[in-house]
Amino acid sequence: MKITFLLTWGDEMGGTEQAVYTQATHLAPRHDIEVLSVFKTREQPFFSVDERVSVRYLVDRTGKTERPVRESDLTAEDCRHLAGLPSDLISPKWEATFDALSDVEMQRALRTIDTDVLITTSPALMSAVADLAPSRVITIQQEHRPSQLRGGTGEPLLLRAPAIDALVVLTERTKQWLEESLGKAAPRLAAIPNAIPEGFRPRSSLTGKTIVMPRRLVPDKQVDHAIQAFAKALPDHPGWRLRIFGDGPQMSRLRNLIQGLGLHDSVELLGPSQHMTEEWARASLTILPSQDGEAFPLVLLEAFAAGVPAVAYDIVTGPAEIIRHGEDGLLVPPNDVESLAEAISRLMGDEALLRSYGEKAHEGSTRFAADVIVKQWEELFTELVSRRDDPRRMAERADRIAHRVAHGGAGRFHAAVAADRTAPSSGDQRAREVVIGASDRSLVRAGGRLSEVRDDLQGSEIVQRNFETVVEALESSGIPYVLLRDRDDNPRRRLAVDAAEQTRVRKALAGAYEGKAVYAELLKPRTHAPGVLLAERLEAVGEVAGLRVFRPVVTSTRTLRFGPAYGCDIEFWRQVPEEEGGDGQFVAPLRPSAVGPKLPSLTPDARTRVKDREYPTLEPLTRKLVSDITFPVDAVYTWVDDSDPRWQERRARRRAALGLEAESSGDEAARFRNRDELRYSLRSLAMFAPWIRKIYLVTDDQTPEWLNTEHEGIEVVSHRDIFTDQDCLPTFNSHSIESQLHHIDGLSEQFLYLNDDVFIGRPVGAQRFFLPNGASRFFWSPTTVPVGEPTEEDEGYFAAAKNNRALLEERFGVTVANSFVHAPHPLRRSVLESIEEDFPESVARTAATPMRGWQDISMVSSLHHHYGYLTGASVPSSIRCAYIDVGTYSRHPELTRLLAMRGHDVFCLGESQDAEVPEHEQARIVEAFLRAYFPVKSPYER
């Protein structure tokens, strides 16, 4: 069988290149193996190549001018010109190195390639092969990173994977994410890990008291965490050394850290080494403190092959697939330096345990031996090649592509499930879930766990349900607890329980929820691996700092999951005895409560109300704190239905009366376009900001047909009810309407103003928008307001910003430069009233301008914030915000990442005036995205 690997840079030093050459070497004895590299970048490849593996290049970059490797009539000038043009085959956002010359050479080579199996090694190359490879060639994408965490480079995966034969990833966790995200559009999916590189590997004696770390010195490898943890452990284990092999931009910073911690005699920064085999033979331990992003770290395989145990952060993918916690290494919670220090100290101080782990590590490395991994690949090749000429193969491919278009999204957007931070169930727990699922057919498997399907629960209801799940178990067993309070906007409930009751708590939960889809995430476990367990299995768990209990819920779309983030935390607070210097108080095991890291007692002496009942707490936790927000916060929307014939007629008459043509530069159709965003923006408030007291929908006597106008939490307000001068109506100028919002009857002093294309992206508290003293926050944008006076040629928002600037210069003697991000605007009625009093002519002129004009001011989206800042009523702040221009094709993949990561507080779906995406296509994309992000109806819908 002829097998071709396609690499971007086959000569370079990288994990992908190392893995490919290792795999090629292992396959070479039984197959015809070729490595096809798009670019030649060195005279000799960094990695040695087995003589049985042929290496071929397309474009030579070793000289002054990039040129084809083949014989060619192209002149040097031709080549320079082509190399300077962007690639049409591969988007620069996927991989910027490709150009027009590489396009020509890839098209020539791939359209006629003579091979049985073509394996791509990046999503960008996969996309090119999906377009270019002959139909009889089996196409496989080999993923070398965690797909669920990729940024722009991962865009082609969900878009183009349906057009290839197979997608192979390194871990089951990534495979599961692809299965759930692609659904019926998925090609053949497989999880096959990397193999240990060939070569003699001497065993370590583990007697050298040396921790070895080969790591690139870049931020995501978090080498500083290893140094800090080593510094904490070293005083109890003198004589140990930490040897770090690698280089990178963090070298100077790490040297300073080592000096600052006084570790210059114990920690060495040694640069890269070509002799790591010998270094592993002298090692006793290795540490892997990386951030999320590791796929399947070869460094752990190399350590295990030498019989060296490991301690690693339990990140999304990688370490947990290699390390068997408590057998050949230890896993600790990500970014927890204290736990990392405790784990390495445990092994540094126990020679017998270290040796036991070393034996198991060496034994366990056989799971990744070449013959084991090659067998999995060969079985996959055989399966796929056997169907090469089956007519159903191409029909199934067409069906997959159709499913992606029909159900996955539109254009360059593809709906994706959230990237879970905790590992899916496996082994005995997975087997037990099969039994539980068989007894309750309403449960489905989502996110690696049994889940209940619900489309009727808001986030706050999920939180309350998990809270009640815990309280029921504790109260049934007579276990006392105290309901805590937080200072931040954490949506979870927290319960404090005496650490002496931990065994009873675990037993109570295990008994109460035996055979149920109730789970607990282990918080800072002392001996057990981090992760999520069925509640019924908690009795076997050792000491933990806390438990996060939850009932998984997923919507029928499978795009919204409620997991541990909405759980209830049980924290085991320890009373420090006097002999240990304690004062009888209980100490927080994880983080402080609203009144600090200590509590005088865990005997409840007060009650606090949550929903419809009271719960035990402590009197200090019932007091009104200076950090509490106790004032009401409303929300205000302005909304237009541009498809309403009556509204269109009113607008046309108004324009005609003003002597205007059908359109003008100040009134772009995009500003009025209704794509049903309001429905989903209201869903975002209901789901993620349930503290909003009331919503006011300001319209030109329009009401969405789906709106539940009977709900007490929403009120439709006519322009006629807020304009003090009725002669200003009808108006079709958003600046005009916004200048009157503070006249809404019953509106709270503090309120949020939102356009219907602005959404809350995750749970946030009122503290995100206001200070407890009532001050409003605002969020500056890096975008600046152009210098100069406003003119009729200015875009409407810039003209208004310039007018705002002039007013502030006259009133306060200062010049403002920046605009604001597209986010909810935190406002105060009193500030808007003061603006109206201080600048009556400007406010009145704006109110009386029925179409956007160059003399407008923008009161709520700009002037309020600067005026409030200069009068002490507003403060600058920050918010995690995304702005996606849906009128630009290149921005659509950001919607997929937004959906998969759900990591932004707020986001806005805007549209530029010169949109390249047709209106109907924009509508499809917006609908597909919003339906996936906010699948749960709000109470404001009929």
Curated annotation (Swiss-Prot):
Stealth proteins are part of a protein family that is conserved from bacteria to higher eukaryotes. Family members were first identified in microbes as proteins that help pathogens to elude the host innate immune system. Microbial stealth proteins are involved in the biosynthesis of exopolysaccharides. Stealth proteins are predicted to function as hexose-1-phosphoryltransferases. InterPro entries: Glyco_trans_1, Stealth, Stealth_CR1, Stealth_CR2, Stealth_CR3, Stealth_CR4. The keyword Transferase applies. It comes from the Bacteria. This is Exopolysaccharide phosphotransferase SCO2592. Keywords: Exopolysaccharide synthesis, Transferase. One of its GO terms (biological process) is polysaccharide biosynthetic process. The keyword Transferase applies. Belongs to the stealth family. It comes from Streptomyces coelicolor (strain ATCC BAA-471 / A3(2) / M145). Its EC number is 2.7.-.-. One of its GO terms (molecular function) is glycosyltransferase activity.
